[in-house]
Amino acid sequence: MSQPELDVRNLIPRERHPLIFRTFDALAAGEAFVLVNDHDPKPLYYQFQAESTGRFSWEYLEQGPEVWRVKIEKVGSAPAKAQ
């Protein structure tokens, strides 16, 4: 099954991470999208590690030199908030 692609190459840098996280947050557990970028999104990986530890998987599908494609999957859900 193919995942939808989120191509951020034409966005200004400050808009990229918020859009990527909104896209991730909208996923159900087990769903994924493919991020398409013009550079290695390794800093984004570290941001996911900090903000979504244990809730995502990260798989490089293509690694440059001009295009990077990364499959990002939601593998769990956030803990329930106390009422």
Residue ranges and their predicted role:
Residues 1-83:
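Positively charged, polar, low-complexity stretches
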